[in-house]
Amino acid sequence: MNSIYKDDSLTLHTDLYQINMMKTYWETGVSEKKAIFEAYFRKLPFENGYAIFAGLERIVRYIEQLRFSKTDIDYLRGLGHYPEEFLTYLENFEFKGSIRSAVEGELVFANEPLVQVEGTLAECQLIETALLNIVNFQTLIATKASRVRMVSGNDPVLEFGTRRAQELDAAIWGTRAAYIGGCDATSNVRAGKMFGIPVSGTHAHSLVQAYRDDYEAFKAYAESHRDCVFLVDTYDILKSGVPNAIRVAKEFGDKINFLGVRIDSGDMAYMSKKVRQQLDEAGFTKAKIYASSDLDEKTILNLKMQGAKIDVWGIGTRLITAYDQPALGCVYKLVSIEDENGVMVDTMKISNNAEKVSTPGKKQVWRITRNSDGKSEGDYIALWDERPDQLDELFMFHPVYTYINKTVKDFTARPILQKIFENGKRVYELPKLQEIKAYKDEQIEALWDEYKRILNPEQYPVDLSQKTYDQKLASIAEIREEVRLKSEQLAKENAK
């Protein structure tokens, strides 16, 4: 076996340009400059009213194991781009920075910091790729699962996507994110072992095909399993599948726990009604109807509108792949950097595309909730030294349409970004997965129904403090003036 497969180092799970930038910083003597980066996404996924943050546990594990291994260094040496002195620098690399982040299960919104990294320029740069890779995927899947949960009501939702996921890691961590977002169990046995997620499963069409007969297959399954859910659509749902499931259930009686039947094809609304009728007429009124087959929140919503008699939803491909929007688009931007005098100077990216203009400065996100009922008034992005939690009233306004504003009184301001690492040491205790799921449910409950609609939700307020807003405008003007002067000087030099 190639020795590389025995090396579980994730340090090179990065883009080449991160290493190249580290080399540039190192050679020009700025690698130890202090810097602050913030990760955020620009648009909510699936046209949803919120997103559910997920991925922090894996970020923590990644940071705690962030070391260049011998095989990492040997590989980089083999590329022939890097001098030995730089490779020695990498070999001695340790993450000594600080990370603040939303906790898993937190509701998050567009254009607000989700993760904030403070440290040397080099170490902040190195972790960008892995951090975005983790947050982009897991937050996307958790949000998709929440949408499924929203339309499913109290019906059990099972995650069935492992075979359709984009490789092993996506299946495992996608399952975890789906559980946080709202799924009740998974078919993925490894995820059950790793994370304590309840596991659930029935059987495949191949079992029925192997016995060439619904009855023989169901009987064989019942002889080896007490809990039985029979897949009834291999040949003919109403003429063979369900009648033979009923036959086996009656023959075995109390020897098995006949949980119900699963439908994986056909007109789910029509078939579920007919199947329900057959089960009820046979006396199995408590038997459940399980449905699978490329389901998602839109299909479930429509099936419920059509009066489908489905009790349990098995969600696979369209959840684990985030089928209708397979990318979140989270970005990682430098917001402050140390100047030659050791002073932190705010910085930003400007663009002719308004949505790509970043907000400079080290910031905190505050969730503003009413004391009267605990409902959220919106999120308030402020510079780090601002303390809205110490104010009696708070003026909130839309960062683009400033005439949309309000003054909030009798409120609580809760900081969203929590300390995870301080000077390279973890200071945050990772909660149990069930605690994360319960926390997410609490946050959903605090959100107004208007923001939870699957179709055309109201836009949740994400406002800037006056100080943050003013600084952003001042920075834009300052950068544009600096660019203008330098471009004029460059034009003069080129004209010589």
State what each model feature region is:
Residues 200, 261, 289, 311-313:
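Hydrophobic residues within beta-strands of alpha/beta enzymes
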Residues 35-91:
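N-terminal, Lys/Arg-enriched amphipathic/low-complexity engagement segments
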Residues 59-66, 76, 89, 134, ...:
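Residues that form generic nucleotide/phosphate-binding pockets
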Residues 36-38, 96, 157, 331, ...:
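A residue-level signal for beta-strand positions that form part of recognition/binding surfaces
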Residues 2-33, 47-48, 295-496:
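Gly/Ser/Thr/Ala-enriched C-terminal appendages of enzymes
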Residues 74-75, 143-147, 161, 452-459:
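Short coil/turn segments at secondary-structure boundaries
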Residues 55-58, 140, 432-436:
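Short amphipathic alpha-helical segments
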